[in-house]
């Protein structure tokens, strides 16, 4: 029996009709209907017969089936119960796919990887991420104690640009710092709205993030470090001096201490957050230990 690619307008429409499926806007459902785009995603991910893939939001399986053809195993998390019978149908030719009907943010990913991908030499996250929760999903996966080698993911263009942004640019912010702390980021391609059904309201981008062997800087408390960096961008037009006065408890009373702390790290208090590198924030984080008055 010959199987037609799912990622075509005609096959997707036929499946929608067959299952009486209606898109849920609340779940950010936009299905890929262009095999060429999917092939570029596969190519960028460098998956092969030794790779285990984690997919989030497989939809009707348009990307999943191509992953199954190229990877050793695919584990796909789908939150929408209505899509489970569709996926069981569309992916029936492939015995290397596991569909998990669960919210990726609530799932025990380490256990799932140990159960389904334990015999894979490397693990990649390859997905057309639901746009409304792209950032929480990525941060959750980056911070898992799971040997993920990298990500090739489709997302809203604006979010992708923030992940990949360089210091001093408009898009650079706390998300750039977290992503680049854990991974080396690069843009794969920009994707037009026309390759989705239904078309999203925003432009899309595919971004590649490869896990670093070691984080970009060494800190003893990642959560505290990220909070400190995020505070510098609380009000982008304000100086870091002003932002940190608002961030720290009794910051207004400790203006002079904040100024001394910034200067001890070699940072001009009049600078804005977007001009500070990740290394600058790491220095600030270390220097803060010398100023016991600065608490939050």
Swiss-Prot record:
GO CC terms, sorted: cytosol
Enzyme Commission number, as recorded: 2.1.1.182
Catalytic activity as recorded in UniProt: adenosine(1518)/adenosine(1519) in 16S rRNA + 4 S-adenosyl-L-methionine = N(6)-dimethyladenosine(1518)/N(6)-dimethyladenosine(1519) in 16S rRNA + 4 S-adenosyl-L-homocysteine + 4 H(+)
Keyword annotations: Cytoplasm, Methyltransferase, RNA-binding, rRNA processing, S-adenosyl-L-methionine, Transferase
Claim: S-adenosyl-L-methionine is one of the keywords in the record: yes
Subcellular location, principal: cytoplasm
The keyword Transmembrane helix is annotated on this UniProt entry: no
Single Gene Ontology MF annotation: RNA binding
Binding-site residues for S-adenosyl-L-methionine, renumbered to this chain: 30, 32, 57, 78, 103, 128
Localization in the cell: Cytoplasm
Similarity field: Belongs to the class I-like SAM-binding methyltransferase superfamily. rRNA adenine N(6)-methyltransferase family. RsmA subfamily.
Function field: Specifically dimethylates two adjacent adenosines (A1518 and A1519) in the loop of a conserved hairpin near the 3'-end of 16S rRNA in the 30S particle. May play a critical role in biogenesis of 30S subunits.
Protein name: Ribosomal RNA small subunit methyltransferase A
């Amino acid at each position: 029996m010959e199987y037609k690619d799912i990622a075509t307008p005609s096959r997707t429409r036929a499946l929608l009709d067959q299952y009486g499926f209606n898109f849920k806007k609340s779940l950010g459902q936009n299905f890929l209907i262009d095999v060429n785009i999917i092939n570029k995603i596969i190519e960028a991910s460098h998956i092969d017969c030794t790779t285990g893939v984690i997919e989030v939001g497989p939809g009707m399986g348009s990307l999943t089936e191509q992953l199954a053809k190229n990877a050793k195993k695919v584990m796909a998390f789908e939150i929408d119960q209505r899509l489970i019978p569709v996926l069981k149908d569309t992916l029936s030719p492939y015995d290397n796919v596991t569909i998990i009907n669960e919210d990726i943010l609530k799932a025990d990913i380490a256990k799932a990887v140990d159960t389904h991908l334990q015999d894979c030499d490397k693990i990649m996250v390859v997905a057309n991420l639901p746009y409304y929760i792209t950032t929480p999903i990525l941060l959750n996966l980056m911070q898992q104690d799971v040997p993920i080698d990298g990500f090739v993911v489709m997302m809203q263009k604006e979010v992708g640009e923030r992940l990949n942004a360089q210091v001093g640019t408009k898009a650079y912010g706390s998300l750039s710092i977290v992503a680049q702390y854990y991974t080396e980021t690069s843009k794969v391609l920009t994707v037009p709205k026309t390759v989705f059904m239904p078309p999203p309201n925003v432009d899309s981008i595919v971004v590649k993030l490869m896990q670093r062997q070691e984080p970009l800087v060494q800190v003893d408390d990642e959560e505290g470090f990220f909070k400190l960096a995020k505070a510098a961008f609380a009000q982008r037009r304000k100086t870091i001096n002003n932002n940190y006065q608002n961030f720290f408890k009794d910051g207004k009373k400790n203006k002079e201490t904040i100024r001394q702390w910034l200067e001890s790290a070699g940072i001009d208090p009049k600078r804005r957050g977007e001009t500070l590198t990740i290394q600058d924030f790491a220095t600030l984080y270390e220097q803060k230990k010398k100023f016991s008055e600065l608490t939050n």
